[in-house]
Regions:
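Primarily secretory-pathway and cell-envelope proteins
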Residues: 17-102, 141-153
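Hydrophobic h-region of N-terminal signal peptides that target proteins for export
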Residues: 8-17
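Alpha-helix C-terminal capping segments
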Residues: 10, 138-140
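Solvent-exposed loop and beta-edge segments used for protein-protein assembly and interaction
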Residues: 66-68, 118-120, 131
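A glycine-anchored, Pro-Gly-centered beta-turn/N-cap motif
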Residues: 122, 128-138
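Sec-dependent signal peptide recognition
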Residues: 1-7
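Extended, solvent-exposed segments with strong compositional bias
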Residues: 98-121
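ATP-dependent kinase catalytic cores of phosphoinositide-metabolizing enzymes
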Residues: 125-126, 144
Length: 153
């Protein structure tokens, strides 16, 4: 009888341990940088497309992290986390630019490696899978000009 009780308790303990109890994004469809128990909203913008050259205003993002492999949380409503890509941006003329090689312009920007994991319900954890240099970056759905900008410093 004790053996049956133990066998039933082990799976239940595993379910209880899997419950996420960390910080939760206050708004859906915005990527938040994770700094311990603090969530920092990324700078959410719409990138201007000029024939494969994308740009956003400003030389640096208001969202900053010292982490070379940043972690993000996003509560998905409309944004599909599996479609997010990570890009490095160049600063030119007081704005951030990204040349993708689509359209008239040729560029070499390729998405950097990410891991996307479902945490709980519609909550996803997104992690850079490689160390990032101290420059400007964004997460962006691969079918949209929406960008979640941040800076690694």
């Amino acid at each position: 009888m004790l053996r049956i009780a133990v066998l039933l308790t082990i799976p239940l303990a595993g379910l209880a341990a899997g419950k996420y109890d960390g910080p939760r994004p206050p708004k859906p469809d915005i990527a938040y940088l994770v700094h311990a128990d603090t969530l920092i909203p990324t700078e959410t913008l719409e990138a201007k497309d000029d024939g494969g050259l994308y740009s956003v205003p400003g030389a640096s993002s208001s969202a900053r992290t010292p982490l070379a492999e940043p972690i993000f949380l996003i509560e998905s409503d409309k944004v599909l986390p599996e479609r997010l890509e990570l890009y490095r941006w160049e600063v030119k003329g007081g704005r951030r630019e990204l040349a993708t090689g689509k359209g008239k312009r040729r560029g070499s920007a390729k998405p950097l490696h990410l891991s996307v994991n479902k945490v709980d319900g519609r909550l996803y954890r997104i992690e850079a899978s490689e160390p990032l240099e101290n420059v400007e970056y964004s997460l962006s759905p691969n079918d949209s000009n929406q960008v979640f900008c941040f800076e690694v410093y």
